[in-house]
């Protein structure tokens, strides 16, 4: 399962 929330994707 991919991480949910605003901490997803490149920083």
From Swiss-Prot:
Q: Does the keyword Isomerase apply?
A: no
Instruction: Pull one GO CC term from this UniProt entry.
Output: extracellular region
Query: Coiled-coil regions in this chain?
Result: none
Keyword check for Secreted, yes or no: yes
Expressed in which tissues: Expressed by the venom gland.
| Cellular localisation | Secreted
| Record's keyword terms, sorted | Bradykinin receptor impairing toxin, G-protein coupled receptor impairing toxin, Secreted, Toxin, Vasoactive
Name under which the protein is recorded: Bradykinin inhibitor peptide
In its UniProt entry, the species of origin is given as Crotalus viridis viridis
List the lineage, top down.
Eukaryota, Metazoa, Chordata, Craniata, Vertebrata
